[in-house]
């Protein structure tokens, strides 16, 4: 059962809540998520299971696609509706033109300060833990890239946005900073993740669907097998003898199986589609197995 289960995370659950639930359903402790979703958020939460947990390192900067609802009129401590108001509530009447002009500042590459209430670490502690103790937290800005930021709808003080962004981008910060730029305050009211890396919403199962599959002994139906993960990495097909050598740490060439891939990493895969290892280039046309399955 090595692979990824894509969950449609329900609102109100932490990502760790979902991991614990799937551990019980799949009857294994080897489950982890590939990127936190806030409790108020729903949508795509990919979970690595069994030996595929070894591949999590390759997903840390996966691009994301979100659809979010921003409420203008006041800001909050967490930059979303779960936080305490930090500004006086004001009546807001924005035009689409005003909003489009402000959105232009949040497209492309820029420095973004993460919310104080986040999973970022400060001297070894999660910043949200410090914030809950009323300790002052101001995280350093980080470079993010927003490839697309589209205004889908504007009604009253609510704006629906769609964003395609780099890993590590906070939609809560975009909402908060947008309110600051417009001088009226704002926070994130709703958030749905439509895609995370190669995983999309149409692949996602609810926890109830996953439980039903497990009850019918059909849990593998919900798993994207390890051999199909990381499609951006070129595949090098190997026979069983070479596969055994790679599992023992032996370097392997890309040819004669295929021409040298223009990639730092390749996947060593058997003819039956099983992932043997992820290889990292060490010499032209020679790869070292950095992760062995």
Swiss-Prot record:
A Gene Ontology molecular-function term?
RNA binding
Q: What is this protein called?
A: tRNA pseudouridine synthase B
Source organism's superkingdom? Bacteria
Q: Which residues form the active site?
A: 38
Q: Which family does it belong to?
A: Belongs to the pseudouridine synthase TruB family. Type 1 subfamily.
Q: What does this protein's UniProt record list under function?
A: Responsible for synthesis of pseudouridine from uracil-55 in the psi GC loop of transfer RNAs.
Query: Which NCBIfam families does the UniProt entry name for this protein?
Result: TruB
GO BP terms in the entry: mRNA pseudouridine synthesis; tRNA pseudouridine synthesis
What does it catalyze?
Answer: uridine(55) in tRNA = pseudouridine(55) in tRNA
The alphabetized UniProt keywords are:
Isomerase, tRNA processing
Q: Which PANTHER family match?
A: PSEUDOURIDYLATE SYNTHASE TRUB1, TRNA-PSEUDOURIDINE SYNTHASE
- CDD domains assigned: PseudoU_synth_EcTruB
Q: Name one Pfam family in it.
A: TruB_N
Q: What is its EC number?
A: 5.4.99.25
